[in-house]
Amino acid sequence: MAVAVVFGASGISGWGITKALLDAKTQNAFSKIIALTNRSLSLAESGLPDDDRLQLHSGIDLQANVDDVIAKLRERIPSIGNVTHVFYTAFSTSHTDNQLMMKASNTKMLRTMVEAMETVAPSLSFIAVQTGSNHYGILFAEVLGERFGPVPLKEDLPRLPSPLRDSLMFYAMADEMDELSRGKSWKWCDIRPDMIVGYLPRPNSHSIAESIGYYLAFHAYLTPGEEVPFPGSEAAWNAKFSLTGQGVLGNFNVHLACKNSIENGEAFNIANKPFTTWASLWPLLAGYWGLKGTAPVGHHGIPDAASWVLDNMDRVKGWEEKYSMKPGRLFKIPWRYFHWALNMPFDRYLDLTRCEQTGFQQHEEHKESFETAWKCMQEAKLLPIVDKSSTPP
């Protein structure tokens, strides 16, 4: 029976894949799921179910040399030699904004993982590598102008022109996998989600569900039942986009792993369907917290959510105590990412034809993805369970 290993299991993608692998529908597909993290993480802290098939291990640093990684895998994980399927979601992005440095670091980590797993797991047959929609240059869309797209963004779009293409780590990672897989008995695929909406046990620099959840939940505490204007720009308010629910992403990874018909190196977009706009979505998200979501207040939206939090710093402790929340999380929110995500003024939704042609038919509304993530955060005491009829504090 198949044995899976997930690299980056404490991240938003890896956590979702691990949970999907543990789901009852896949119980007969994988006899063991090995979830790997760099930093120490207990099962209780992880929020993953207590399942005999799950092995949670930490301290596997892919920035070390490959011989050290091989030695640690063999020393700490006796069952690593039985692995047949790898799900790779480990990224190093938080230490720098330099795209060239990120490309070099992440490409090296990927090569180290592949060379290590080839050595320790002779039955290796499949590697799913997560990249993302920035393969299409979303980061540079405003620079590209009319050269961006066209939308919907399809997997076979040509790469960006130089010098922009030279800084994108996803191109380098795909080229690395093509080289490493040449002539091998295993296949790999390139999975490209858009911005991922989901839960994760630790603060993350790219968690849009957490930042929007805290923004709205704290608003609901300060001004319950009132209007909350969209904090992004007017241009972003009507731009069409698609986000990717964590559960959809996890289930699609498992779906591909259980198929034998994909081509080596094939790329797949995966996202919620249909696409949406903040004009449609923001009122629904605000409504979850008993608020009335409205259009942005000005051309450029609210300038700085972090400053707004600091301006209300004296109210945070009372908010956390009222709802028995874990303290201090609000001050760790990546507001820069929140600001960027809510101010993209261009259409950028993904084409999902290819993923549907594999037989994958799970669709999820964007509102549902946020609510699923928020309920997990509420259970973990990260967000409050709000009485929407409450009076102002």
Curated annotation (Swiss-Prot):
Molecular functions per Gene Ontology: oxidoreductase activity
Active site: S233 (proton donor), K259 (lowers pka of active site tyr)
Pathway: Mycotoxin biosynthesis
Tagged with keyword Oxidoreductase: yes
Key words, A-Z: NADP, Oxidoreductase, Virulence
Pfam family membership, one: PRISE
Superkingdom field: Eukaryota
SUPFAM superfamilies: NAD(P)-binding Rossmann-fold domains
Enzyme class name: oxidoreductase
EC number(s) per entry: 1.-.-.-
InterPro entries in alphabetical order: NAD(P)-bd_dom_sf, PRISE-like_Rossmann-fold
Positions with a binding annotation for NADP(+): L54, A286
Keyword NADP: yes
Segment forming the signal sequence: none
Function description: Short chain dehydrogenase; part of the gene cluster that mediates the biosynthesis of sirodesmin PL, an epipolythiodioxopiperazine (ETP) characterized by a disulfide bridged cyclic dipeptide and that acts as a phytotoxin which is involved in the blackleg didease of canola. SirD catalyzes the O-prenylation of L-tyrosine (L-Tyr) in the presence of dimethylallyl diphosphate (DMAPP) to yield 4-O-dimethylallyl-L-Tyr, and therefore represents probably the first pathway-specific enzyme in the biosynthesis of sirodesmin PL.
Family stated for the protein in its record: Belongs to the short-chain dehydrogenases/reductases (SDR) family. Highly divergent.
Database matches in PANTHER family: 3-OXO-DELTA(4,5)-STEROID 5-BETA-REDUCTASE, NAD-DEPENDENT EPIMERASE_DEHYDRATASE DOMAIN-CONTAINING PROTEIN
Protein's name in the database: Short chain dehydrogenase sirQ
Native species: Leptosphaeria maculans
Classification of source organism: Eukaryota, Fungi, Dikarya, Ascomycota, Pezizomycotina
Gene of this entry: sirQ
